[in-house]
From Swiss-Prot:
Transmembrane segments: none
Listed InterPro entries: Myo_ane_neurotoxin_sf
One Pfam family in the UniProt entry: Toxin_4
Organism encoding this protein: Condylactis gigantea
Designated name of the protein: Delta-actitoxin-Cgg1b
GO cellular component, one term: nematocyst
Localization (cell): Secreted; Nematocyst
Hydroxyproline PTM sites in chain numbering: P3
Alphabetized SUPFAM superfamilies for the sequence: Defensin-like
Length: 47
């Protein structure tokens, strides 16, 4: 999957570890949205 930044990863600075995964639509069952950004077409999720 495509990595994305969770709030727990810290500020969006180049070089930070991206612990989330982009899901089109909403997060898969058993996953949760991990940031507060509002995206219409995808969510940043983690297990």
């Amino acid at each position: 999957g495509v990595p994305c930044r969770c709030d727990s990863d810290g500020p969006s600075v180049h070089g930070n570890t991206l612990s989330g995964t982009v899901w089109v639509g909403s997060c898969a069952s058993g996953w949760h949205k991990c940031n507060t950004e509002h995206n219409i077409f995808h969510e940043c999720c983690k297990e």
